[in-house]
Amino acid sequence: MKRREFIVKTALGSAAAALPFSGELFAQARQAAGKPLDIVALYGATASEMFERGIAEMGGMGRFVKKGDSVVLKPNIGWDQPPEVGANTDPDLVGLVVKKCFEAGAKEVLCFDHTCGNDWQNRYKMSGIAGKVEANGGKMVAGNDEYMFAERDIPRGKSLKRAQVHKLAANPDVFINIPVLKHHGGAKITCALKNYMGCIYDRQWWHRNDMPQCIADYATCQKTTLTIVD
């Protein structure tokens, strides 16, 4: 499927709205769609405030998380930078997602990332994400230790045929992808699909072997329930 065809089919198949946070157009979008929105883009408030509004317009977290589910969160925690730098996903947003998952009935909420350095404990802490996740009842899980990864086939891959995938990403009840949207030197942007690189062990192989194609290949097999872009 060509990019243009994908965009057209996605737009036709989903109820979507891109609106200012204070706008009153959501009701019109919902009425036109006849159902909760599938795609919402918001601007003009904090990440947490926009998530609160957006998830409500999509039918609430209960649409995605059911009672007894084990939920896995995959934010971007790659860098040893504080929240104000914006290198990682907003920690307040991640903490709020944990809270909403438990309110929807989740049994547990687990959070991980394969960070861009072996000092993952420090990056979890410095990003502010560990503190917010744990304060809301979630658990941080090691993302860099090789024993946490298992070989997986990528049947539809063109460049990437196999990968060592983090066990939490393999087949969770609910997988929530929470990237931060940024410019990237190699991929031009880093967002939802590139955030999957934190699910695999050997990222350097991707960099050496057509990284954009590897990103697309891995996306063919990663089960994702909900994507929340900071």
Task: Label the predicted regions.
Residues M1-D230:
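N-terminal and secondary-structure boundary signal
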